[in-house]
Design a protein with these regions (language model features):
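Aromatic-Pro/Gly-enriched surface loop or interdomain linker
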Residues: 1-24
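Short alpha-beta junction capping motif
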Residues: 22-70
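Generic recognition of flexible, low-complexity loop/linker segments
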Residues: 15-19, 43-46, 174-178, 211
Length: 211
């Protein structure tokens, strides 16, 4: 509707062409659910960002699982659901290492690269497909470093509509966490609120630590 020209980059292209591909662009926007990445993919995105590229993460539960690609066949992906994490199945002991590259699988967080280090936020909780809105932080409009982002946005809440769950914040929720790598100078523009208590929201397992 706005007439912006864009190119689509697949995960396969990101893995194999890496920074050579990303460096052609001033801005790279992730898809809605960029959950599975190889080390080469993360390296490319991180270097692109550090070299001045504009990396815009507009998804949820991103950069979560470490994967490996088959060296002998395009499109074949391996994932080991090791240790913790929200997962469809649990890998058995002895099955935590990838066959394709012999590296330890599981969460990128367990491999020393939590998503907060790359994009400032990471998944915190999961619930039903009940999506809600975001409320813009009042102090953001008075901050000249970031208030340009809200040029033309006159409302105080955004994200009321969506194809899944009828709102932008639902099912899997991300949050900032300086312990895991969110920069000290990060600015939170908006936060979701009013998630209904009847939706069974739970912390992801890796957040539930005890003695």
């Amino acid at each position: 509707a706005k007439g912006f020209a864009f190119d689509l980059i697949t995960d396969h292209e990101l893995h194999h062409e890496a920074l050579d591909l990303l460096s052609r662009y001033k801005c790279v926007v992730t898809g809605t659910h960029p959950e599975y990445h190889t080390a080469a993919m993360l390296d490319a995105l991180e270097t692109y960002r550090d070299q001045g590229g504009n990396l815009v993460y507009l998804g949820g539960n991103g950069f979560y699982w470490k994967i490996a690609l088959a060296p002998y066949r395009d499109g074949l992906v391996e994932i080991r659901r090791a240790e913790g994490g929200i997962r469809a199945w649990a890998a058995e002991p002895g099955e935590y290492y990838n066959q394709f590259d012999a590296e330890y699988g599981g969460l990128w967080r367990r491999n020393g690269r939590p998503p907060q280090q790359l994009v400032g936020v990471g998944v915190r909780a999961q619930g039903d497909f009940v999506g809600l809105y975001y409320r813009i932080k009042p102090e953001v409009r008075a901050n000249p470093d970031v208030n340009w982002i809200l040029d033309g946005v006159e409302v105080e809440t955004i994200g009321h509509e969506g194809f899944s769950g009828h709102g932008a914040a639902g099912f899997e929720l991300d949050r900032a966490d300086k312990r895991l790598g969110t920069p000290e100078n990060a600015v939170i523009l908006a936060s979701s609120e009013d998630h209904p208590p009847e939706a069974p929201w739970v912390l992801v397992p890796e957040e539930q630590l005890t003695h």
